[in-house]
């Protein structure tokens, strides 16, 4: 996993959970994209501590550091102030010591928190994300997790409103901690179940939902109101496994409450990665995609991905005149690969039936 970080320097602050397990407390790096290693200093990374990716006070327990640079590791004791470092050195403690002040003065290293974190991939053995672990990470867009993650602390993603993509490195039929993650993300987010080779088994869009309270009578009793189908979608689990049929059943009501910007990716994602899709649900999604075919095509052209575009026309969601329009748009945008592919698909999928010999003879006679 550290191969993805090999070209850069990373520094981790952590504390022991047990002799072989640690809790991550801080991450420093050169880039706002990080792959957290599964092992640090020979110990398994089991948890993200509270406020791990947020600028908040560190715990008062003994804190260790591990620095990774160019494929090599260095570990030792971490202290907050330079003065504390001098005190430890004067006491002839025989190990590396680094102060937080020294780390923060490093011109290359940035604390990966708040506005300087964009994407995080967690290791396979993490079981817990602490409370407020990503508090105020306003630029974070994507997080990747594994099925062993089952505990997510309160407000773990508070104010992470740009977090729109959640990658589950698991099969869609595996029990995961996805429900716990979604409970902390009330805004719209796309979840993809991906295998090790990157193949997407299923992609699900969870719409945003809102909570409000109405006061009932003088007794100061409050009634909770939920707006949006996103809440219902987030309940479609049994023993950690997502219930795809239950998820699909919310679509008819979502068509009443949600906008096309929400419904198009909901329908398209289920058709394109159609794991566990019933005939009834497929028919409902296909009807909607055909009704919105112009908007769907515009989205696909903007992404410049050939496989989904071919799927769109191959399945009959797009018409002949739309593929002609798509050729013109791709040409205008100077996407030559797209132009060539669209022209080939037009010939393949919308070929004119050849005239019979009798028709050809009749046309020749009339022309004569």
Residue ranges and their predicted role:
Residues 2, 7-21, 28-46, 58-128, ...:
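Structural signature of tandem-repeat unit edges
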Residues 48-50:
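Extracellular beta-strand-rich solenoid/capping regions of secreted or surface-exposed proteins
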Residues 268-285, 307-309:
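Repeat-mediated protein-protein interaction surfaces in helical alpha-solenoids
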Residues 284-292, 317-324, 337, 347-360:
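Ankyrin repeat arrays, specifically the small/polar loop and inter-repeat linker segments at the C-terminal end
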Residues 299-300, 326, 330:
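Ankyrin-repeat helical register
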Residues 305-313, 335-344, 351:
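Ankyrin repeat structural motif
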Residues 320, 363-368:
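Extended, charge-rich intrinsically disordered regulatory tails
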């Amino acid at each position: 996993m550290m191969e993805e970080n090999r070209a850069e320097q990373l520094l981790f602050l952590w504390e022991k959970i047990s002799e072989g397990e640690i809790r991550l407390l801080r991450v420093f790096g050169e880039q706002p994209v990080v792959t957290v290693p599964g092992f640090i200093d020979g110990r398994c990374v089991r948890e993200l501590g509270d406020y791990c990716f947020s600028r908040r006070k560190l715990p008062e327990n003994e804190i260790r550091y591990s620095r990774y640079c160019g494929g090599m590791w260095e570990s030792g004791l971490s202290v907050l102030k330079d003065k504390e470092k001098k005190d430890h050195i004067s006491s002839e403690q025989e190990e590396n010591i680094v102060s937080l002040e020294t780390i923060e003065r490093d011109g290359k290293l940035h604390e990966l928190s708040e506005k300087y974190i964009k994407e995080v991939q967690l290791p396979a053995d993490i079981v817990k994300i602490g409370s407020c672990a990503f508090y105020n990470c306003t630029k974070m867009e994507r997080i990747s997790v594994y099925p062993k993650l089952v505990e997510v602390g309160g407000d773990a993603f508070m104010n992470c409103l740009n977090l729109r993509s959640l990658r589950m490195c698991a099969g869609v039929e595996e029990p995961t901690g996805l429900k716990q993650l979604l409970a902390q993300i009330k805004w719209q987010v796309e979840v993809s179940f991906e295998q090790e080779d990157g193949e997407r088994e299923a992609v699900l869009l969870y719409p945003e939902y809102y909570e409000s309270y109405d006061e009932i009578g003088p007794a100061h009793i409050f009634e909770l109101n939920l707006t949006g189908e996103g809440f219902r979608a987030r309940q479609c689990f049994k023993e950690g496994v997502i219930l795809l049929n239950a998820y699909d059943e919310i679509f008819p009501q979502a068509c009443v409450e949600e906008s096309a910007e929400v419904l198009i990716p909901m329908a398209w994602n289920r058709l394109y990665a159609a794991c566990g899709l019933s005939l009834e649900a497929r028919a409902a999604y296909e009807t909607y995609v055909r009704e919105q075919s112009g908007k769907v095509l515009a989205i696909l052209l903007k992404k410049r991905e050939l496989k989904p575009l071919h799927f769109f026309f191959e399945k009959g969601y797009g018409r002949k005149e739309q593929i002609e329009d798509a050729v013109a748009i791709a040409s205008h945008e100077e996407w030559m690969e797209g132009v060539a592919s669209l022209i080939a698909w037009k010939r393949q999928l919308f070929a004119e039936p050849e005239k019979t010999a009798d028709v050809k003879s009749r046309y020749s006679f009339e022309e004569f």
